């Protein structure tokens, strides 16, 4: 506006009436998005919206579900320094070139094996992106490969070759590579004829699989110069950072060898890990075009490293998952004559063979409609390949490959009759399939890749009169359980059908729950394949349907089936979706098959040692096996990690300390100040603000190091909300804190985890009575260090604060490697000031916050040669703030990190004098 409202001496300046409507709508802007198929679509957003709002609009427009692979690239960027729309930043701060603006929808992350993409839509977008990059010369391609690629692109677009339609020269208007000629198009037309019968999706998959072998596949290039001012290109890919001179790779730095990545002004640094023979750190430096391009390169390196480390799941980890989740007993020495059933849903086999001799009486396949959205099969599945289906061999050591032919809509039931003997013997497998039968024989009885645990017996029970099987759970399965019960049973099989172990440590229970009027079942889950942990019930709301159904759902129950669907290969969010989808069925009933640990009386335990395995030692009076020494405690921890008992102990520890009141957090005026309604501070340890409104969701957490006269003080708090930033900075001011530790990014997986409560340098920001200025920002691959100047606007006093933000934690689960995290914790320790508290927060202020407090406490104990009992540390934290260290995966991660610090000597012992 050219004029403003001003009150001068009671008079108001005149305003042009044409300006008034602009005042109301000036924040709404138009963004033009160029899609990969050439379509341009406009979207309306406000300048105050974050980039995530626009990203969500684009994803919803395309119907994309695997959103993490894509992004929006700025149109005005040079190819020398690509820049992407940031999800957590406001649009007005990113698109400063005026409106309407133009952005390009592109693939951001190219995974090494696109065959693992789950959705056909994602593969199609990969295809379009690769085709465009080759066509425009961004992805260089040898001529012979370009001909083959173009032929698959033609098959995808035109379908099968038809001589009556496709006359010579029918590709004259098509464009595949720069500087193509008629000879090139003639070769493409000739090769097109050979692809007859390929579907569009299959042709595109063939295209992708050839394109991924190209030298620059998935490489994001940034222009730079070496220290002699010679031009080069820095490429970022899934495996690390490469340096190119005249498009020839001269150096490559794998992520595993990179200690950290940093920049200062327009200099970019790669810090490599020291080799055994080296005495000092090796640093590689480059000159970028300017500060902005240097920061773009650093940011892209961090995002690529974080993305591909989170995606990486080692084969041995997958084996651990299958071992952890496979149903059955660990005891293979006892003889079992009972029949028992295992169910295969969606093509995944549960215990298809026994470690010992096991004969399979019959297998029957029954097609059932899927009540949940099916998962698109991988390209590797033989049923998607073109003319490469191999004959199925009769050997049962190929049983895993046979199972890939099962479609997602088939429910397969295996009925085994086990006869376990001490010695191994051959077993025969007969498979009844329609329309033909095949005989399978097993020569390798171990079948370790098919089964990890052996089932022993089943104690099922019959259906009660009038009861019915849940949706997706076949009645024949329940009947089979009924028939094999020893001596029959009067229990209701629709309620209790069990896969009991010989030692009775767990069994399966079928639970039916009908939602309440609001459509809620009343329980929370944690875990999932993305979190590398089984799905476990973490909380039951009192008087909810889950609490009042018979049999009732219990905390700690492991979810096995949801309405007959195997969920062992699904992520946490997918499982939540399946549960919500059950409300849309005719019965609205949720049928859960859960694994529950059996409760044994004390008389059932043969020894005190066996009793101690059930109840954690740290919960009873401490009596460590290795004595009260650091070495003994580490031996005990290592043994517990190998056996899995540390996780059992952790799950049995109370989440909230009994008897501690939580009242102030639940007052009406304070409810909207809590990010999560169930993560609240105790009254006795909450942080009180100065003034009338004294509430903030924050707790004092003091960790005493015994025999060292040392107390590490923390303030654990949630990530600030937009309307609680003033209270957050008031805590910093009241406590005169000099260090803030942030353990999350602003958004993760499209969800806001924390409001940005600090300004970008050199901007300033006002919160309440405080003026915050970010004076500097130093970035590495794992964390960002900022220096803040906080000024009290009433008194003019100033206070300097260091802000550390850890950015290497993956969006879900825990890091695969603890190196970056341990380096970060050491840096935090180096900045700690005497007895001053350190303010630590993540999103809720309990999970990653608890991991950091546990790790620093363990390091302090290690350097003083004192024993470390992680469960004791967690209990002490939970006595001061509920639910510290939120998940089993976090607890396992920090336990493994503690053991690594001890075994590798990453913390030096202090001189006892």
From Swiss-Prot:
Enzyme class: hydrolase
Membrane protein topology class: Peripheral membrane protein
Key word Transcription regulation present: no
Biased segments, Low complexity type: 454-470
GO cellular component: cytoplasm; cytoplasmic side of plasma membrane; cytoskeleton; cytosol; plasma membrane
Domain of life: Eukaryota
Spans annotated as Disordered: 363-400, 420-475
Keyword Ribosomal protein among UniProt keywords: no
Binding site for substrate: 811, 842-848, 886
Biased composition (Basic residues): 382-393
Domain FERM: 29-312
Alphabetical keyword list: Cell membrane, Cytoplasm, Cytoskeleton, Hydrolase, Membrane, Phosphoprotein, Protein phosphatase
PROSITE patterns in the cross-refs: FERM_1, FERM_2, FERM_3, PDZ, TYR_PHOSPHATASE_1, TYR_PHOSPHATASE_2, TYR_PHOSPHATASE_PTP
Main location per the UniProt record: membrane
Molecular function per GO: ATPase binding; cytoskeletal protein binding; phosphotyrosine residue binding; protein tyrosine phosphatase activity; sodium channel regulator activity
Positions of the Tyrosine-protein phosphatase domain: 646-901
Residues with PTM Phosphoserine: 357, 359, 367, 381, 425
CDD domains named among the record's database cross-references: FERM_B-lobe, FERM_C_PTPN4_PTPN3_like, PDZ_PTPN3-4-like, PTPc-N3
Database matches in Pfam families: FERM_C, FERM_M, FERM_N, PDZ, Y_phosphatase
Family under the similarity heading: Belongs to the protein-tyrosine phosphatase family. Non-receptor class subfamily.
Protein purpose: May act at junctions between the membrane and the cytoskeleton. Possesses tyrosine phosphatase activity.
UniProt name for this protein: Tyrosine-protein phosphatase non-receptor type 3
Native species: Homo sapiens (Human)
Organism phylogeny: Eukaryota, Metazoa, Chordata, Craniata, Vertebrata
């Amino acid at each position: 506006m050219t004029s403003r409202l001003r009150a001068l001496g009671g008079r108001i300046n005149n305003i042009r009436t044409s300006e008034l409507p602009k005042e109301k709508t000036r924040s709404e802007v138009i963004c033009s998005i160029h899609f990969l198929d050439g379509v341009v679509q406009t979207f309306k957003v406000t300048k105050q919206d974050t980039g995530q709002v626009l990203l969500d609009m684009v994803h919803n427009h395309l119907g994309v579900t695997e959103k993490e692979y894509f992004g929006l690239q700025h149109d005005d960027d040079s190819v020398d320094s690509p820049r992407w729309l940031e999800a957590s930043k406001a649009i007005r701060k990113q698109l400063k070139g005026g409106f309407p603006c133009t952005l390009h929808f592109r693939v951001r992350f190219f995974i090494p094996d696109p065959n693992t993409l789950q959705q056909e839509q994602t593969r199609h977008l990969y295809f379009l992106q690769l085709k465009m990059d080759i066509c425009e010369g961004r992805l260089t391609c040898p001529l012979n490969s370009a001909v083959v690629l173009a032929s698959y692109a033609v098959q995808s677009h035109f379908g099968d070759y038809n001589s009556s339609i496709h006359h010579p020269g029918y590709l004259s208007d098509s464009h595949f590579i720069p500087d193509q000629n008629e000879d090139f198009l003639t070769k493409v037309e000739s090769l097109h004829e050979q692809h007859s019968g390929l579907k569009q999706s299959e042709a595109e998959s063939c295209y992708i699989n050839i394109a991924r072998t190209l030298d620059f596949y998935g490489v994001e290039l940034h222009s730079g110069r070496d220290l002699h001012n010679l031009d080069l290109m820095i490429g970022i890919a899934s495996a690390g950072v490469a340096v190119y001179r005249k498009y020839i790779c001269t150096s490559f730095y794998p992520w595993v060898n990179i200690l950290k990545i940093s920049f200062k002004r327009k200099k970019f640094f790669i810090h490599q890990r020291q080799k055994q023979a080296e005495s000092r750190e090796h640093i590689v430096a480059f000159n970028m075009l300017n500060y902005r391009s240097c920061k773009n390169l650093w940011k892209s390196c961090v995002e690529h490293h974080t993305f591909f480390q989170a995606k990486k799941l080692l084969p041995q980890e997958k084996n651990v998952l299958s071992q952890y989740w496979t149903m059955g007993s660990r005891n293979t020495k006892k003889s079992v004559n009972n029949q028992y059933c295992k169910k295969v849903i969606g093509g995944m086999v549960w215990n298809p063979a026994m470690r010992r001799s096991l004969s399979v009486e019959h297998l029957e396949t029954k097609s059932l409609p899927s009540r949940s959205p099916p998962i698109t099969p991988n390209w590797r599945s033989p049923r998607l390949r073109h003319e490469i289906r191999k004959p199925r061999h009769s050997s049962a050591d190929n049983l895993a490959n046979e199972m890939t032919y099962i479609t997602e809509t088939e429910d397969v039931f295996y009925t085994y009759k086990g006869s376990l003997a001490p010695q191994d013997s051959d077993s025969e497998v007969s498979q009844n399939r329609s329309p033909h039968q095949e005989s399978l024989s097993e020569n390798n009885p171990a079948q370790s890749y098919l089964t990890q645990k052996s089932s022993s017996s089943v104690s099922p029970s019959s259906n009660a009169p009038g009861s019915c099987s849940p949706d997706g759970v076949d009645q024949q399965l329940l009947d089979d359980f009924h028939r094999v019960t020893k001596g029959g049973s009067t229990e209701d099989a629709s309620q209790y059908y069990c896969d009991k172990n010989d030692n009775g440590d767990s069994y399966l229970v079928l639970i039916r729950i009908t939602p309440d009027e609001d459509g809620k079942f009343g329980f929370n889950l944690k875990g999932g394949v993305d979190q590398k942990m089984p799905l476990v019930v973490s909380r039951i709301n009192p008087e909810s349907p889950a609490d009042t159904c018979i049999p009732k759902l219990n905390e700690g129950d492991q979810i096995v089936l949801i309405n007959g669907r195997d969920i062992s290969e699904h992520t946490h969010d997918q499982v939540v979706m399946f549960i919500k989808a059950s409300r849309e069925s005719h019965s609205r009933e949720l049928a859960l098959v859960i694994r529950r640990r059996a409760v044994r009386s004390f008389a059932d335990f043969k020894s005190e040692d066996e009793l101690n395995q059930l109840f954690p030692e740290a919960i009873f009076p401490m009596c460590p096996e290795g004595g009260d020494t650091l070495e003994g405690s580490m031996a005990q921890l290592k043994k517990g990690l190998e056996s899995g008992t540390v996780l059992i102990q952790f799950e049995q520890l109370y989440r909230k300390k009994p008897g501690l009141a939580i009242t102030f957090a639940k007052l009406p005026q304070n409810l909207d100040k809590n990010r999560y309604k169930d993560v609240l501070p105790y009254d006795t340890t909450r942080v009180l603000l100065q003034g009338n409104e004294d509430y903030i969701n924050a707790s004092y957490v003091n960790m005493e190091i015994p025999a060292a006269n040392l107390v590490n003080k923390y303030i654990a708090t949630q990530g600030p909300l937009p309307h609680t930033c003033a209270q957050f900075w008031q805590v910093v001011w009241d406590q005169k804190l000099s260090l803030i530790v942030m353990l999350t990014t602003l958004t993760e997986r499209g969800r806001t985890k924390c409001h940005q409560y600090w300004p970008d340098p050199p901007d300033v920001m006002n919160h309440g009575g405080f003026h915050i200025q970010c004076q500097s920002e130093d970035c590495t691959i794992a964390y960002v260090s900022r220096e803040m100047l906080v000024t009290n606007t009433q008194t003019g006093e100033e206070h300097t604060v260091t802000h550390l933000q850890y950015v290497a934690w993956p969006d879900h689960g825990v890091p695969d490697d603890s190196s970056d995290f341990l380096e970060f914790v050491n840096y935090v320790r180096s900045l700690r000031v005497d007895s001053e508290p350190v303010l630590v927060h993540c999103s809720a202020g309990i999970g990653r916050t608890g991991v950091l407090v546990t790790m620093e406490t363990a390091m302090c104990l290690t350097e003083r040669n004192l024993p470390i009992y992680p469960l004791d540390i967690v209990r002490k934290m939970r006595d001061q703030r509920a639910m510290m260290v939120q998940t089993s995966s976090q607890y396992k991660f920090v336990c493994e990190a503690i053991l690594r610090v001890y075994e590798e000597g990453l913390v030096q012992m202090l001189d006892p004098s």
